[in-house]
Regions:
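Hydrophobic membrane-embedded segments
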Residues: 1-136, 153, 164-166, 304-327, ...
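Short alpha-helical catalytic segment bearing the HExxH-like zincin motif
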Residues: 159, 168-181, 185, 189, ...
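Juxtamembrane interface helices immediately C-terminal to a transmembrane segment
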Residues: 22, 26, 30, 182, ...
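Short helix/loop segments within enzyme catalytic domains
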Residues: 52-54, 114, 119-121, 178, ...
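Cytosolic-facing loops and C-terminal tails of multi-pass membrane proteins
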Residues: 2, 83-117, 147, 245, ...
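Active-site scaffold of zinc-dependent metalloenzymes
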Residues: 147-169
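A Zn2+-metalloprotease active-site environment signal
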Residues: 186-216
Length: 346
């Protein structure tokens, strides 16, 4: 399990770096939807199981000649073997690091869950209802929203700032609402939680943090493109004005904001260069994305030679044998497993 986790984290990091390099050219050539779709590649790799043993190539050792000299092996009786040293030692460091990583991942996700629940409680406690959109999305105004935002997976909300009516003209209000409803329709809120769990597994990884920021930017630009499909220049200008008026620095990671300032330049550039892709271009984009996914996942899946190379490279860099760490972790967790079995028996 630890070996699979190490291979998965390293392979997902490589795929994140690949998407970071490709997202710009892909967005310029095929549009923001294609760039956003690329992020499925590292996400799927995070949950990709190892290749079954039956699918792996089998290496057969050559049969030795009958005249090859035999080998004599000496065994020491168990009673004569020295006892293993007790207590903490350097051999326990890898297991401690694995435990530290797991605690960091759990703590990261738990912190975001608690922070999001507190934010939702503040917004709902101070919010004033402004109706229901699309039959199931409640629209509220609250002083705790710096700009329009969507939140909630099961119970869906769109929160507007308290000065929404004064800050935005009627057309901008309609476009801002359409943007946030678009996030709900696309399932972006659930995707954001999945992205946070993945980031929690990579909490120590600077590549993952850069990938998360880029993923959120691509998500917003893909939603922009959906709202503005075949829009007139006047509508695009009004939409850009709404984005600028919504610019703010703070953001809730699990929510979808109309805008945060670190994405402003890229989104406005995208709005100014909008073009409608032909069906042929969309087919090429879909085919290329699918081919990249098949190649990337197939090349990095656990059980392949590439995955074995990843494991070997990690062992060489760290000087730690992953199989030994797995045995130590299993021994450390054995008492916990025994207690769990006893509890189930009662």
């Amino acid at each position: 399990m630890i070996g699979w986790a190490v291979e998965t984290l390293v392979a997902a990091t490589l795929l994140m770096a690949l998407v970071l390099m490709l997202r710009g050219p892909v967005a310029r050539r095929f549009g923001p939807h294609a760039a956003y779709a690329l992020w499925a590649l590292p996400a799927v790799r995070m949950v990709l199981p190892p290749i079954p043993d039956a699918w792996r190539p089998v290496d057969f050792a050559p049969i030795g000649a009958a005249t090859e000299p035999g080998q004599v092996m000496m065994f020491v009786p168990i009673a004569d073997m020295p006892a293993l040293p007790q207590g903490w030692g350097m051999a326990d460091v890898p297991v401690a690091l694995v435990a530290f990583w797991a605690l960091g991942a759990i703590g990261f996700v738990a912190w975001h869950v608690v922070a999001h629940r507190r934010f939702c409680a503040r917004v709902l406690a101070s919010g004033q209802g402004r109706g229901v959109a699309q039959g199931h999305v409640r629209v509220i105004e609250t002083r705790h929203a710096a700009g329009p935002l969507a939140f909630g997976v099961w119970k869906r909300y769109v929160a507007m700032p308290a000065d929404f009516g004064e800050r935005y003209d009627p057309q901008e209000q309609a476009l801002a609402l359409a943007h946030e409803l678009g996030h709900h329709a696309r399932g972006d809120l659930l995707v954001n939680w999945a992205a946070l769990v993945i980031l929690g597994c990579h909490w120590f990884n600077p590549v993952a943090w850069a990938a998360f920021r880029a993923f959120r930017a691509d998500q917003e630009m893909a939603c922009d493109a959906m709202v503005l499909a075949r829009a007139t220049p006047a509508v695009r200008h009004a939409y850009a004005s709404a984005i600028v008026k919504s610019a703010h620095g703070g953001a809730v990671s699990a929510a979808c904001h109309l805008h945060s300032v670190n994405e402003l330049k890229g989104r406005l550039i995208m709005l100014s260069k909008h073009r409608v892709m032909s069906p042929a271009t969309r087919r090429v984009a879909g085919t290329a994305t699918l081919a990249l996914a098949v190649f990337g996942l197939g090349a990095t899946a656990s059980g392949t030679q590439a995955a074995e190379s990843i494991r070997t490279g990690v062992e060489q860099v760290t000087g730690v044998e992953i199989a030994q760490v797995e045995r130590q972790a299993a021994a450390a967790l054995a008492p916990v497993a025994d207690v769990a079995r006893m509890a189930q028996g009662t």
